[in-house]
């Protein structure tokens, strides 16, 4: 092949490759256009990605534009509907562990708040543990003297249920040394009581914003439930006390919508005493089991209707459930009057199950140690001593404390009834132990369709801490 033929051959081959390359590009463009024009079958250059995190919910709108990501943080969408909460309570055969925060054990080397009065409340999406901090951390000098109930440093904060009350995941709710909180299906409502004893004020927050206030009307330590309030069809109910802790005081029911108070009524309960009610929804009404800090070792029972009419009395059962208390065998029970002369008391709870009642109490008759829940046949309506079931939650070798009720909404469980749940506070430190501080952790239990074995889910922290040895 002469040189001219070689040049022609190479040129022809090059031209062929160029033509092939052009054809491939044309085919590529055609395929791309066909794919992008086919709605729903191909990727879109613009899109929205929603990411949720456990601690809080952060919604990101991420627009993917060529090779550039534009990230825009948008407000978390609120729920559209109020929860009904008119369903009946589920029948519980036993109570299974839901969560345990181990806050004091973790706090020996972690950044955990000094707290008291923890309680749990649920929204349609989650349950949260609320607690009253002392404005200080465990194993720190500012924990000294935190046995005191009321101070300007106390705040209501919350974490997802099961998390320790740590500084990294806690959410501020209100300035408070007494509080309640609940979710109506759209937003959280919190009530935080703070201020001087004679002129305390309760600030009602809705969606994190102060909306309304309640001023002390008796001038004697206005206080509230220290457990979940109750929302039914968008209206939220709670109980407050103002007056002496050891004689006749004044009691009121409050009703709010979207955080604004729309009704209130005085509770006429001469000779009786109501504090720290543990309430839950049941068949369209609010049922509360409370604390008599005056004389009764039986617990007050308050049932609230949506129109704020109410019935009030005492848990009928012939078994006492407050602390301190006398022997079970010496207790007769009363549906209308306080029985006993021990005075003082501790926050507690009970659940109506038809005519029966599940009631929690300390195992010790004289101190806040141990905890059990017992089922008393006909105990809601009669002076029955027929104890048909018992489950130990904390053995009597370990400290307990307050306890209270809440329910799992049907939006969480997909059941046709409200699951009864309770929490038990386990107080550590002063006044029972040699420390400079007082704090607590909690165990949370929920009703199930099966019997559950007794055990001791106690606090378990080894005291004293380093700060106590200085």
Curated annotation (Swiss-Prot):
Glycans are attached at residues 39, 46, 54, 144, 293, 398. The chain crosses the membrane at residues 15-35. It catalyses: Hydrolysis of alpha-(2->3)-, alpha-(2->6)-, alpha-(2->8)- glycosidic linkages of terminal sialic acid residues in oligosaccharides, glycoproteins, glycolipids, colominic acid and synthetic substrates. N-glycosylated. Pfam families: Neur (PF00064). Residues 32-86 are annotated as: Hypervariable stalk region. Catalyzes the removal of terminal sialic acid residues from viral and cellular glycoconjugates. Cleaves off the terminal sialic acids on the glycosylated HA during virus budding to facilitate virus release. Additionally helps virus spread through the circulation by further removing sialic acids from the cell surface. These cleavages prevent self-aggregation and ensure the efficient spread of the progeny virus from cell to cell. Otherwise, infection would be limited to one round of replication. This is Neuraminidase.
């Amino acid at each position: 092949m002469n040189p001219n033929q070689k040049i022609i051959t190479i040129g022809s081959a090059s031209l062929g490759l160029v033509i092939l390359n052009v054809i491939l590009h044309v085919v590529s463009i055609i395929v791309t256009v066909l794919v992008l024009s086919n709605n729903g079958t191909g990727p879109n250059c613009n899109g929205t990605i929603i990411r949720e995190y456990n601690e809080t919910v952060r919604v990101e709108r991420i627009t993917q534009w060529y090779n550039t990501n534009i990230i825009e943080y948008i407000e978390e969408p609120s729920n559209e509907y109020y929860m009904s909460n008119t369903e009946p309570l589920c029948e519980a055969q036993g109570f299974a562990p839901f969560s345990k925060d181990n806050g004091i054990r973790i706090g020996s080397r972690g950044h955990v708040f000094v707290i008291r009065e923890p309680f749990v409340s649920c929204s349609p999406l989650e349950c949260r543990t609320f607690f009253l901090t002392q404005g200080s951390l465990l194993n720190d000098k500012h924990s000294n003297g935190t046995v005191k109930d009321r101070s300007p440093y106390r705040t209501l904060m919350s974490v997802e249920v099961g998390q320790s009350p740590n500084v990294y995941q806690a959410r501020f709710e209100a300035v408070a040394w007494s509080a309640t909180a609940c979710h109506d299906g759209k937003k959280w409502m919190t009530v935080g009581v703070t201020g001087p004893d004679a002129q305390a004020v309760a600030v009602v927050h809705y969606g994190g914003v102060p909306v309304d206030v309640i001023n002390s009307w008796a001038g004697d330590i206005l206080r509230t439930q220290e457990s979940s309030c109750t929302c039914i069809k968008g209206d939220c109910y709670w109980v407050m006390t103002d007056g002496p802790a050891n004689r006749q005081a004044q009691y009121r029911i409050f009703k709010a919508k979207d955080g604004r108070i729309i009704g209130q009524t005085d509770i006429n309960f001469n000779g009786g005493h109501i504090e720290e009610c543990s309430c839950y929804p049941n068949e369209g009404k609010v049922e509360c089991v409370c604390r008599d800090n005056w004389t009764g070792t039986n617990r007050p029972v308050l049932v609230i209707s949506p129109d704020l009419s109410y019935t009030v009395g005492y848990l009928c059962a012939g078994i006492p459930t407050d602390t301190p208390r006398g022997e079970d065998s010496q207790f007769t029970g009363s549906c209308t009057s306080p029985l006993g002369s021990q005075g003082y008391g501790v926050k507690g709870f009970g659940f109506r199950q038809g005519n029966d009642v599940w009631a929690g109490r300390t195992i010790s008759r004289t101190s806040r140690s141990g905890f059990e829940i017992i089922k008393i046949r006909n105990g809601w309506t009669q002076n029955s001593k027929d104890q048909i079931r018992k489950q130990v939650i904390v053995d009597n070798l370990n400290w307990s404390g307050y306890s209270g009720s809440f329910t799992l909404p049907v939006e969480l469980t997909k059941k046709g009834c409200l699951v009864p749940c309770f929490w038990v506070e386990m107080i550590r430190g002063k006044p029972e132990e040699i420390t400079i501080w007082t704090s607590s952790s909690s165990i949370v239990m929920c009703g199930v369709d099966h019997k559950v074995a007794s055990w001791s889910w106690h606090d378990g922290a080894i005291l004293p801490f380093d700060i106590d040895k200085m």
